[in-house]
Amino acid sequence: MKGFVSECSLTYAGAMPPRAAPLSPDDRREALIRATRPLLYEHGTRVTTKLIAEAAGVAEGTIFRVFDSKDDLVDTTIARCFEPGDVLVRLDEIDPELPLRDRMLAMTSILQQRFLAIFELMRAIGAVGPPRHLHDRPEIVHGLEEVRRRLLALIEPDADRLTMPPEQVLHVWRLLTFAGSHREIADNDLLTPTQIVDTVLHGVEKTPERSAR
């Protein structure tokens, strides 16, 4: 019997995968933020450290080695959600050689997805707007300015075709994209990127050319 136990022990010990190398504190924080983010959409700020630990594949105590409290982790994750994230990368992937309408359709799709995600998060955490303390965070302020700069760069090449300056076109476009992506403002009838772009570029008045389409 002893030999059997010993043999089994060796067999299972040999089958066990090697233990993963421990993460640095910064990497552990990032892993916990990634695990917490989808949980906020599902549970809001009521999410528990048990759920977070399970999602991250760690013990609950691990959370408190890199965050002061659950609230600290939740607040950090919410702040991360308001950073531009991959929006900048996706805007940079838009081909500047595309026609103006196609460029604007692409940027509208990207920003609408961003707005929808932010609005869904605010509903989940019971907020009516971004937390006030986020307005002055350098990474968010700088990130939003970079988003604006990239959006403007996608419109400016066709400035001579527009009836108003590109900055004003961008302003009108952002207002319509924001409102048309907000379920309450839009009465649950969200505008599509095509509706938004065609309204900004062509208005709603019929013309012989458009009527013939």
List each model region and its residues:
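Basic, helix-initiating cap at the start of DNA-binding domains
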Residues: 1-55, 71-72
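Amphipathic alpha-helical segments that line or abut small-molecule/effector binding pockets
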Residues: 34, 101-120, 194-202
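Short amphipathic alpha-helical elements of helix-turn-helix/winged-helix folds
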Residues: 35-39, 76, 110, 176
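Alpha-helical DNA-contacting segments of helix-turn-helix folds
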Residues: 40, 74-81, 118
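Short hydrophobic/aromatic patch on the recognition helix
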Residues: 57-67
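Amphipathic alpha-helical linker/stalk segments
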Residues: 79-107, 116
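Amphipathic alpha-helical packing segments from all-alpha helical-bundle domains
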Residues: 114-120, 124, 132-160, 167-171, ...
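Conserved NTP phosphate-binding and transfer environment spanning the P-loop NTPase/kinase superfamily
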Residues: 157, 175-186, 193-209
